[in-house]
């Protein structure tokens, strides 16, 4: 069986992290979201994957090429006109029943296998959710889909659509007919099929998450490393304390006096310490340096970063290539975060810092602040509002 992965979107609400890459390539658990999907597809009967690419497609194509034993074909959605239109681009690559997966989803292997093994012609994965109004809410009748209500104004129902389906080849004809009325999303196509009497079976997913906003990266990252294996490939000096499951990549050096509590994933070629503290739910990307007496907890530190000594980083995201001076502090707490003209009230959120920034010593960043890509912040500054990409704070 083949799988079609929809990976053409940018993810505007994830800026600045998607300014140089599609959202499916964001790093969680020290690997791209899309790679986690491939891991879930292994040994499920999927032998070929068609990836629908678009925004910054070269980033995906260069990274994956052919992934291990799974053959990959690429088709391009030149204009992002919705998920139904994206799937339509794969029409000439599919001749039998196939699986559709949004590229920004995290889904477990067992759920994919259950979907593949289902005997129904049309099937979909659903998930119970505590805040269903953020998604398409599904209503069922004896396990079959009755209707989908997209992002209702209040929480109704308890199950949502994951956007993961098994379709027959004729879904492409369905899309072409239905899209003439102006429908461009797969959920709307599925809703129309149900209205016209089509039976769509539902299967409850076990583990499923998606990434919509920058802070979702932290939640998904935590889930991805929760069961990280203890692997210590690097060099660990004496008087280092390691508790719980901690993965340390090759050529990484953990200097004396460091205190690390898992789950933690540290990439290859890193330098940690001396006397640094790394606390649970933290990932540190390849070739990064955490200088002495710095504390990092529940954060995503992407590759090629440098964090100065005596710094404190909590509930934060630091994108690749960023250099942070000594005595930096990302304060955590409650704040209202503005994303693409949306305002979200959040608790216990630190800083969200784009790639290739240079931040001087003795800088404090208020909770929930977003610092864009390629920003230059002078020493001894207190950042109390968002900083646009390319800005200088003098």
Task: Show where each model-derived region lies.
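Short N-terminal binding/cap micro-motifs at the start of the first secondary-structure element
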Residues: 11-16, 133
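Catalytic-core segments of class I nucleotidyltransferases/pyrophosphorylases
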Residues: 116, 141-226
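Extended, small-residue-rich solenoid/repeat segments and analogous flexible loops
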Residues: 180-183, 192-281
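Glycine-rich hexapeptide-repeat left-handed beta-helix
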Residues: 291-394
């Amino acid at each position: 069986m083949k799988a079609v992965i929809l990976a053409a979107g940018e993810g505007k609400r994830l800026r600045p992290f998607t300014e140089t890459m599609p959202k499916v390539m964001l790093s969680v658990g020290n690997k791209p979201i899309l790679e986690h999907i491939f891991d879930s597809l292994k040994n499920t009967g999927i032998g070929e994957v068609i990836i629908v690419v678009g925004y910054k497609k070269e980033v995906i194509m260069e990274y994956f090429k052919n992934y291990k034993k799974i053959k990959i074909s690429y088709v391009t959605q030149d204009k992002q006109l919705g998920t139904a239109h994206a799937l339509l681009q794969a029409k000439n690559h599919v001749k039998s029943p196939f699986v559709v997966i949004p590229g920004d989803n995290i889904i477990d292997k067992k759920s994919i296998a259950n979907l593949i093994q289902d005997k129904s012609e049309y099937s979909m994965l659903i998930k119970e959710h505590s805040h269903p109004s953020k998604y398409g809410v599904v209503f069922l009748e004896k396990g079959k889909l009755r209707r989908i209500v997209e992002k209702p104004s209040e929480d109704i129902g308890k199950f949502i659509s994951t956007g993961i389906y098994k379709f027959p080849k004729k879904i492409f004809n369905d899309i072409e007919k239905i899209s003439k009325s102006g429908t461009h999303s797969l959920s709307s196509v599925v809703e129309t099929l149900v209205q016209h009497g089509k039976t769509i079976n539902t299967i409850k997913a076990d583990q499923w998450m998606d990434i919509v906003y920058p802070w979702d990266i932290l939640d998904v990252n935590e889930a991805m490393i929760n069961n990280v294996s203890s692997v210590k490939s690097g060099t660990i000096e004496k008087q280092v304390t390691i508790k719980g499951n901690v993965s340390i990549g090759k050529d990484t050096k953990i200097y004396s006096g460091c205190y690390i509590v898992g789950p933690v994933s540290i990439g290859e070629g890193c330098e940690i310490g001396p006397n640094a503290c790394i606390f649970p739910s933290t990932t540190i990307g390849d070739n990064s340096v955490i200088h002495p007496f710095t504390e990092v907890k529940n954060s995503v530190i992407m590759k090629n970063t440098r964090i100065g000594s005596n710094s404190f980083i909590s509930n934060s995201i630091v994108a690749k290539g960023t250099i942070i001076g000594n005595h930096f502090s990302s304060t955590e707490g409650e704040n209202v975060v503005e994303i693409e003209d949306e305002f979200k009230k959040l608790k216990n959120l630190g800083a969200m810092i784009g790639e290739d920034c240079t931040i001087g010593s003795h800088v404090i960043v208020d909770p929930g602040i977003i610092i864009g890509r390629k920003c230059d912040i002078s020493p001894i500054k207190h950042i109390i509002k968002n900083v646009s990409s390319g800005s200088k704070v003098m």
